[in-house]
Amino acid sequence: MASSTPSSSATSSNAGADPNTTNLRPTTYDTWCGVAHGCTRKLGLKICGFLQRTNSLEEKSRLVSAFKERQSSKNLLSCENSDRDARFRRTETDFSNLFARDLLPAKNGEEQTVQFLLEVVDILLNYVRKTFDRSTKVLDFHHPHQLLEGMEGFNLELSDHPESLEQILVDCRDTLKYGVRTGHPRFFNQLSTGLDIIGLAGEWLTSTANTNMFTYEIAPVFVLMEQITLKKMREIIGWSSKDGDGIFSPGGAISNMYSIMAARYKYFPEVKTKGMAAVPKLVLFTSEQSHYSIKKAGAALGFGTDNVILIKCNERGKIIPADFEAKILEAKQKGYVPFYVNATAGTTVYGAFDPIQEIADICEKYNLWLHVDAAWGGGLLMSRKHRHKLNGIERANSVTWNPHKMMGVLLQCSAILIKEKGILQGCNQMCAGYLFQPDKQYDVSYDTGDKAIQCGRHVDIFKFWLMWKAKGTVGFESQINKCLELAEYLYAKIKNREEFEMVFNGEPEHTNVCFWYIPQSLRGVPDSPQRREKLHKVAPKIKALMMESGTTMVGYQPQGDKANFFRMVISNPAATQSDIDFLIEEIERLGQDL
């Protein structure tokens, strides 16, 4: 059997070579390289792919070098259709005399369009490079009045007359300059962080397609991608692959609202036509540390926030099941009808996971709809090491899952998943005749728009689908495990240091690490209202200095009667242990004299 290792004498003799391998001489593949550049992009790429597949590793390297040299010498950014000689050549362009009206679809606007977009791409690539450069600031902070007054030619006011493309390019640069680099490895301020390059490419393509998700008619590929991805997510939860439903929504708050609407419609379908007057006095339940969107939905859907009953939590922020059952009985005694509970898998502040199994038992006992808000913690379902923290989620009637959080998908990307098929459609369908005709030439069950409370719906699926294709489930698992390891690293570094005090004892369940920084003036001081009052001011002062310096960002907040503390969250796969070390050192540097 011939060796798969390329022969060093292949250029002079083919003796002993694998008959299934074609080793082209450098002059031959260089010639074909030139042919590829003279063809249409599609055919040229096929020729290039063939040449790379059929050559040895050394010759592949030469081939790549030949392509680079050829493109560099011609200053080309891509191969295009030679029939029109439409190659993307970078040329010096005076944008000060060009306006939006000079771009496509204007007559003869193709060259100006190409040059303008190449400038925009250059701005974007420069921003991407700086985002991953740790010597670059996370933000260049300015107060609102400074930005409103104008910064070095950057004016937010709108004018009646068009401005030149040169000014538009300046505006593009400055918009990024004065924003926050949420993809920076040292940005820890929110649950949604990172800048995934595959996701970025997907978002660019999504904007270029500029379509709507309401019908298969105008978004055939995207609609199918959404259905396939939602099905996969339901399977990961543990539901049957044959049943179930779901839709992507503008965010976790809207996904949670969908769950309440679906539950209400399931138990009281007449509410759709007759309103709240046709149903009994309904109450719903959620933990006192759940996301505020549950109360907001209660207000928006006509229940009233007083009828969103808060369940007590233990010191780690988890629902106390006994209190949940007691509040159900109390509500029933008062003449209310309990119908829904929200359990949280990964609370916003503590990162706590409610005991879903015990809550599900109570829901079955009293016939309540169980929703799991896994907006923050849903990503852990991708991890074989950590998915046990969501045990029982397969018993839920609905689940919120935000890939734009722990999975690093670019904003926005949130899914509401329903165990029973047909409820979303029945709850929200209005049969708008101009969109949802039943006599179309294709299977209209793929027209998903009537399941949504929106009409127009942004394409959120493509970047997520593309990332999943690029990473695989194991890729998501790896980056999620890494983020949780970094949280464990931070906890281990600060738990026994006198400069820091943990908000609660024990290792974090999620990547949330909650702690106080204790300045020198408060170390060793016994707990008292005066000490808590002083401690309450520490985190805001450090955060203000942090933003002024622009070196890093981390959030803070109070919780119950606790003084302001830092809430560290990690969801950016670009972060490393050195970034955690930097954060600790920066907090100490900024807070040492407080």
From Swiss-Prot:
It catalyses: L-glutamate + H(+) = 4-aminobutanoate + CO2. GO terms for biological process: gamma-aminobutyric acid biosynthetic process; glutamate catabolic process; locomotory exploration behavior; social behavior. Keywords: Decarboxylase, Lyase, Neurotransmitter biosynthesis, Phosphoprotein, Pyridoxal phosphate. Its cofactor is pyridoxal 5'-phosphate. 4-aminobutanoate binds at Q190, L191, S192, R567. GO terms for molecular function: glutamate decarboxylase activity; identical protein binding; pyridoxal phosphate binding. It comes from the Eukaryota. PROSITE patterns: DDC_GAD_HDC_YDC (PS00392). One of its GO terms (cellular component) is inhibitory synapse. It holds the Pfam family Pyridoxal_deC. Residues 1-13 have a biased composition (Low complexity). The modification N6-(pyridoxal phosphate)lysine is found at K405. Its EC number is 4.1.1.15. The modification Phosphoserine is found at S78. Residues 1-23 are annotated as: Disordered. It is an enzyme of class 4 (lyase). InterPro entries: PyrdxlP-dep_de-COase, PyrdxlP-dep_Trfase, PyrdxlP-dep_Trfase_major, Pyridoxal-P_BS. Belongs to the group II decarboxylase family. Catalyzes the synthesis of the inhibitory neurotransmitter gamma-aminobutyric acid (GABA) with pyridoxal 5'-phosphate as cofactor. This is Glutamate decarboxylase 1. It comes from Pan troglodytes. The gene is GAD1.
